[in-house]
Structure formats: C-alpha cells, structure tokens
C-alpha cells in the first residue's frame, strides 16, 4: 500500500499525518509524489502508520513495505 492508501483508509488529512509523523507538509508531499526522501523520514511516517495499525489490531509494517517511496540514502 502507498502512504496515501493508508492515509485515506485511516480517514486522516495530510495535516494529521504530518502531525502524527512529526514531519513538514512539503516533506510528506514529496514522499507521496515519489521524490526521494531519507529513510529516517520514511521511518517517521511508518511510525505514525504503525501506531494506527496497532490501535486497529493489525500487524505493523516496515518502511520498505511502502509502495512508491523513493529513498535518497
């Protein structure tokens, strides 16, 4: 699944995901658009996703599981 798939499934706005992941909106947009992001940033996004997955009783994911994410490092 992509970042957007998770965001939409959770009913989160982009602002909500940014807040949960402690990242800036432009960083999130770059990740969604397929521009390179650092693995640490992907880790923050996945951390936010995993918290919600855990709340829903679902298994966690790794940043390498996110479709469409390009790493800068």
Language model segments and positions:
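A short, Lys/Arg-rich alpha-helix, primarily the initiator
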Residues: 1-20, 47, 56-67
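Residue-level detector of alpha-helix boundaries and kinks
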Residues: 13, 30-31
């Amino acid at each position: 699944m992509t970042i957007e798939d998770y965001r939409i499934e959770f009913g989160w706005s982009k602002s909500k995901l940014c807040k949960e992941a402690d990242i800036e909106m432009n960083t999130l947009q770059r990740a969604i658009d397929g521009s390179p992001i650092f693995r640490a940033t992907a880790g923050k996004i996945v951390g936010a996703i995993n918290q919600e997955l855990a709340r829903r009783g679902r298994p966690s994911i790794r940043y390498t599981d996110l479709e469409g994410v390009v790493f800068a490092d």
